[in-house]
Amino acid sequence: MAVAGSWQPPRPCEVYRAEWELCRSVGHVLHHYYVHGKRPDCRQWLRDLTNCREWEESRSAEAQRSLCESEQVRVQAAQKHTLVWALRQRPPTDWNLPLPQEKDK
């Protein structure tokens, strides 16, 4: 178990600020609207930035807990997507045969 005073936020506060600014940028908003049909919700990045700064200033246990929960949710959301391609256990048996030659005429 780590020493109680040695905990650091999962990311530096500058990263939360950069992610929040990127989320609010015109290019990102347009891309997100094109792909998902709605504006991105940047409130979680702002909450994380606020909690990170609060933890740096006052070592708030509530801010620490909130940051940890937010990162866990973010990691779980990234892992829940299924693979597009089915992974093979071994290559096809005819992988080394020459390719068929198409006749142009």
From Swiss-Prot:
CC annotations in GO: synapse; synaptic cleft
Domain of life of the source: Eukaryota
Post-translational modification comment from the UniProt entry: Rapidly degraded by proteolysis following neuronal stimulation, resulting in increased AMPA receptor clustering.
UniProt-listed GO biological process terms: negative regulation of long-term synaptic potentiation; regulation of synaptic plasticity
Tissues expressed in: In the postnatal brain, expressed diffusely throughout the hippocampus at a low level at 8 weeks (at protein level). At 16 weeks, strongly expressed in the stratum lucidum of the hippocampus (at protein level). In developing and aging brain, expression is strongest in hippocampus, especially in areas CA3 and CA2, throughout the dorsoventral axis.
Keyword Secreted (UniProt): yes
InterPro entries to which the protein is assigned, alphabetical: Pants/Emi1-like
Cellular compartments annotated: Synapse; Synaptic cleft
Main location: other
Record's signal peptide: none
Pfam families named in the record: PANTS-like
Functional note: Negatively regulates long-term potentiation and modulates adult synaptic plasticity. Stabilizes the interaction of RTN4 isoform A/Nogo-A with its receptors, inhibiting clustering of postsynaptic AMPA receptors at synaptic sites. Upon neuronal stimulation, degraded at synapses, reducing RTN4 signaling and allowing AMPA receptor clustering at individual synapses.
Family of the protein in this entry: Belongs to the UPF0545 family.
Name assigned to this protein: Synaptic plasticity regulator PANTS
Organism: Mus musculus (Mouse)
